[in-house]
UniProtKB/Swiss-Prot annotation:
Residues annotated for heme c binding in this entry: 121, 124-125, 244
Annotated organism of origin: Bos taurus
Needed cofactors: heme c
Family recorded in the similarity comment: Belongs to the cytochrome c family.
GO cellular component: mitochondrial inner membrane; mitochondrion; respiratory chain complex III
Keyword Membrane carried by entry: yes
UniProt name for this protein: Cytochrome c1, heme protein, mitochondrial
Cofactor binding: number and manner: Binds 1 heme c group covalently per subunit.
Mitochondrial matrix domain ranges by topology: 316-325
Transit peptide limits: 1-84
Length: 325
């Protein structure tokens, strides 16, 4: 009996260094087939492991990465050197009163800005997308806007005889153009075409900061910079040479409300007016945003309560699979 037990133990354990007979014996005792046993041979181990990159490849990849980074830096440096003559001064960010999340436009400033446009800017620049009716309720009453429109003569027609005629302006009329066509505008401004100011704030990078800096940034050209006749130096304008003469200066006009017409005040008011012209829905958009935030503050707790109590049954429901018998 003892000899039989020793023989069985030797078959299960096997000799030292030969694990396969012992494993085969264990598999046979447990009811497993011999083909299901894993073979721990050197070939199987080498196939199951993942070899990394060699040292030479790592060095090559590191060198390529350093060359790519150096080439990118050199390209940026050369581009900056080539475009140094085209460098323009970026406008600073000014603390406009309407830039707050809940801040509205200054409507008294809009009224003064329209006065600046009417007396200073309208001689060269048009505003094709702004009508006199747009001023009603913003900076003028309806009667005041009608009086402003009647100051200009608008071509209309034809009449019963088929001829065009001139009539006083109406609220539905748009601001008059200073020139009949672009060719006439270029001929009167030494070949430069004055841009339309309806959306100039939205059309320029920097918005009203750029327009304010451009209006107040005229200065004498630095030493070594020469400009041809009819051009003026402005560091905020691309190329620094602009064909528009300095349009504003201290006491360039008198405001109706008695505000001192300093250069910065005039530039601020006309920039505010141009911001309103480019975005007349500015105040309405912020009011709607505030109302939406208030409504969402009331609706979100209700939605959360509905989700928490109405859908908790479905969320905690468990499905049990019962196989067919």
């Amino acid at each position: 009996m003892a000899a039989a037990a020793a023989t069985l133990r030797g078959a299960m354990v096997g000799p030292r260094g030969a694990g396969l007979p012992g494993a085969r014996a264990r598999g046979l005792l447990c009811g497993a087939r011999p083909g299901q046993l894993p073979l721990r041979t050197p070939q199987a181990v080498s196939l199951s492991s993942k070899s990394g990159l060699s040292r030479g490849r790592k060095v090559i990849l590191s060198a390529l990465g350093m060359l790519a980074a150096g080439g990118a830096g050199l390209a940026v440096a050369l581009h900056s050197a080539v475009s140094a003559s085209d460098l323009e001064l970026h406008p600073p960010s000014y603390p406009w009163s309407h830039r707050g999340l809940l801040s509205s436009l200054d409507h008294t400033s809009i009224r003064r800005g329209f006065q600046v446009y009417k007396q200073v800017c309208s001689s060269c620049h048009s505003m094709d997308y702004v009508a006199y009716r747009h001023l009603v309720g913003v900076c003028y009453t309806e009667d005041e806007a009608k009086a402003l429109a009647e100051e200009v003569e608008v071509q209309d027609g034809p009449n019963e005889d088929g001829e065009m005629f001139m009539r006083p302006g109406k609220l539905s009329d748009y601001f008059p153009k200073p020139y009949p066509n672009p060719e006439a505008a270029r001929a009167a401004n030494n070949g430069a075409l004055p841009p339309d100011l309806s959306y100039i704030v939205r059309a320029r990078h920097g918005g009203e900061d750029y327009v304010f800096s451009l209006l107040t940034g005229y200065c004498e050209p630095p030493t070594g910079v020469s400009l041809r006749e009819g051009l003026y130096f402005n560091p905020y304008f691309p190329g620094q040479a602009i064909g528009m003469a300095p349009p504003i200066y201290n006491e360039v006009l008198e405001f109706d409300d008695g505000t001192p017409a300093t250069m910065s005040q005039v530039a601020k008011d006309v920039c505010t007016f141009l911001r309103w012209a480019a975005e007349p829905e500015h105040d309405h958009r912020k009011r709607m945003g505030l109302k939406m935030l208030l409504m969402m503050g009331l609706l979100l707790p209700l939605v959360y309560a509905m989700k928490r109590h109405k859908w908790s049954v479905l969320k905690s429901r468990k499905l049990a699979y019962r196989p067919p018998k």
